[in-house]
Amino acid sequence: MNFLSHYYFDRNRGNPYEVLGMVLPDLIKNADKSWNIHPEKNIHLFSEDENIKSLLFGWKRHLEVDKIFHNSSFFLYHQHQIKVSIKDSILGSPVKPFFLGHISLELLLDNLLLSENLIDVEVFYKLINEVDDQILKKFINLNQIEDTDRFFYFFDIFKKEKYLYNYSNTEKITYALRRICMRLWQNPFTEEQEYHLTKSLILYKTKLSGEFLHIFELIDLQLN
């Protein structure tokens, strides 16, 4: 799941460290895709400070949410249906429809949460801005990452630009997909492909809107 979908499960929690921990695995990977850390396997390292423990608590919830989501019939069905619906839109693109179907589904879920006013993005940004950088730095250092400047460079941009607001606009999802794909391919889509991809996703959002909440309810039951 993407940032806002993860936040959905902590939307009623007021602990900034738990909320940040819930999205931290993706932030770490976005800052440097070579970083592959597993704090959940070294719990004893994170027991001396309550805020550090809260970051770890959120981290573990993130992993559990993704595990439930990616093994659900909802995910398997809709990522396949999106793949089928967009494959003609991206003919000739180096991007595989399967890859795009997976990411598109996650971004559409974020979009629907915003469209239905089920989360408050401003509260999300407010909470993560309350996290003490020194505590976050210590958590990252405990995971054997020394180059925290690299992380905080990305994290500061993430907080400043607040690009998650853009997910409320379905047309901006294609832009987000392009940015993600550009990490792997220099020119993932032509302008014409982007146009047709956007139309396909807008159409699929209509199909998804009537049932997307079921997956959040399912995960919530298993998580809590």
PLM regions with names:
Residues 82-155:
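Active-site-proximal alpha-helical scaffolds that flank and shape metal-associated catalytic sites
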